[in-house]
């Protein structure tokens, strides 16, 4: 079932931040209250007329994010997603009811339990490392969406009669490309356009609020260790830039998490250390790490972890812009209030996932 289109909540949030501009008043209790009143209306109050449907004609030929031309013969009624990123996106597009199989460990995803709990009992079709070809084929989905990492397995999937799209949303533009691709494939183009506009509007408001504030240096630490960091080729780099920061690891050439030394971190001497959403260590362990005692971020107490209560916002999911908003509130608290981050999260998850967050961290 395709969800009703609503953007009023997100537009209200964007307007609220824009109105605050780049003044310190945005962080005041009164301003926060005013922003909250703009964006915490109930879904019924915020409902707007559904956007006009943009018809898709089948057979439809699209180009996926591996550059493959794929023809979808008829509108897909059953879907299988082997990737958390695509599953999250399909929920935002309102086609979760059409899913018949999802990636492994879906039962552990808080986002699913809050927005589409039925997905947690669907058959697993594996992971990017261990994809279950035969299990997926047995579900006879009309369309399968997989990560680009599975490119070598796609010919085998096609031999089993599956129609397959690969996604690789490794930067902001490619995230928009993935939204376009799946919206077109699932005949939810209008919904996809609204979703992109909501993300773009909020990022624009964030940029306008930050304005020409001085950009601090940010060290983005990885999931497994504080000595892992994200270079300019990773999605996290775009989050730092969106939040008005400079990536301390801008010189790193690795396309995945790079291993670095304590000496290198101290040489970069970042103003802030930000832990990945799914880090298996905590802020206190970094603050108490004697090897980092001379780092400016540690001395100033500027060590934070990205939100993870709902999902990892440093993954290229639709809600990843919230990671930028949160980071903006950390780096530029006089321009971007924590309340605005909360309001954006409320608006986004209510509109596109059907729930209001109980926790924001």
Which residues does each predicted region cover?
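A short, structured surface patch at a secondary-structure boundary
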Residues: 81-139, 143-145, 149, 248
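Bacterial lipoprotein signal-peptidase II cleavage site
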Residues: 20-30
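Proline-aspartate-enriched helix->loop->beta-strand connector
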Residues: 125-128, 133-146, 162, 261-278
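Alpha-helical, coiled-coil/dimerization segments enriched in small aliphatic residues
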Residues: 229-257, 261
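N-terminal low-complexity, Pro/Thr/Ser-rich intrinsically disordered segments
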Residues: 35-68, 72-73
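Hydrophobic core
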Residues: 15-19
């Amino acid at each position: 079932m395709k969800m009703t289109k609503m953007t009023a909540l997100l537009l209200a949030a964007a307007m609220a931040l824009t109105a605050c501009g780049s003044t310190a008043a945005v962080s005041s209790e009164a301003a926060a209250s005013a922003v909250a009143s703009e964006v915490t209306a109930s879904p019924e109050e915020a409902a707007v007329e559904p956007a006009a449907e943009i018809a898709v004609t089948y057979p439809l030929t699209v180009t996926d994010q591996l550059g493959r031309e794929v023809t979808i013969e008829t509108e897909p009624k059953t879907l299988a997603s082997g990737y958390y990123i695509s599953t999250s996106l399909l929920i935002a597009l309102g086609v979760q009811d059409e899913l018949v199989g999802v990636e492994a460990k879906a039962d552990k995803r808080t986002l699913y339990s809050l927005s589409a709990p039925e997905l947690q009992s669907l058959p697993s079709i594996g992971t990017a490392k261990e994809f279950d070809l035969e299990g997926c084929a047995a579900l006879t989905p009309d369309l399968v969406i997989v990560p680009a990492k599975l490119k070598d397995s796609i010919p085998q999937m096609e031999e089993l009669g599956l129609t397959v799209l690969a996604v690789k949303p490794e930067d902001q533009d490619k995230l928009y490309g993935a939204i376009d691709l799946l919206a077109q494939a699932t005949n939810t183009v209008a919904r996809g356009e609204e979703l992109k506009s909501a993300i773009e509007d909020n990022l624009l408001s964030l940029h306008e609020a930050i304005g020409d504030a001085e950009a601090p240096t940010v060290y983005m630490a990885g999931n497994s260790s504080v000595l892992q960091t994200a270079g300019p080729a990773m999605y996290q780099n775009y989050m730092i830039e969106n939040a008005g920061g400079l990536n301390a690891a801008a010189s790193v050439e690795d396309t995945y998490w790079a291993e670095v030394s304590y000496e290198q971190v101290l040489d970069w001497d970042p103003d802030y250390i930000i832990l990945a959403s799914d880090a298996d260590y905590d802020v206190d362990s970094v603050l108490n790490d004697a090897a980092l005692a001379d780092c400016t971020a540690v001395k100033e107490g500027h060590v934070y972890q990205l939100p993870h209560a709902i999902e990892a916002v440093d993954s290229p999911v639709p809600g990843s812009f919230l990671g930028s908003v949160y980071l903006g509130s950390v780096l530029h608290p006089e321009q971007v209030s924590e309340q605005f981050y909360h309001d954006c999260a409320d608006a986004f998850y209510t509109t596109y996932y059907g729930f209001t967050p109980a926790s924001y961290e």
